[in-house]
């Protein structure tokens, strides 16, 4: 039987909810990068992040502010960046984000990048 090495990164919010969603996203990604690199060094083959990992968990509410946090898959900022890390480390990365599938249509989803 083959062995599969998996990793999970979960952390608290780097900033606060009064900040703009793009600023929160940038801080969260910056905080994840060292752990992505560590996972790559340790030979992780499948790396997962927590739900809506670039933002606070706002999903139970209806605050329109968070619409600005939505990104496209596969062409959004976070997905494109994670494609680079997946390629660099030859790993699959599960990228849970708030997706804008089309104007006005939003999903709490995950892109799977290999």
Language-model segments: residues:
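Hydrophobic structural segments
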Residues: 1-114
């Amino acid at each position: 039987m083959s062995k599969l090495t998996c990793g999970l990164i979960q952390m608290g919010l780097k900033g606060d909810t009064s900040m703009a969603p793009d600023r929160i996203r940038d801080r969260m990604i910056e905080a994840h990068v060292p752990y992505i690199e560590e996972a790559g060094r340790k030979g992780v083959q499948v790396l997962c992040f927590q739900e809506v990992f670039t933002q606070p968990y706002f999903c139970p509410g209806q605050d329109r502010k968070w619409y600005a946090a939505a990104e496209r898959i596969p062409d959004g900022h976070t997905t494109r960046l994670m494609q680079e890390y997946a390629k660099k480390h030859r790993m699959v990365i599960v990228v849970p984000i708030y997706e804008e599938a089309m104007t006005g249509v939003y999903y709490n989803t995950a892109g799977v990048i290999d």
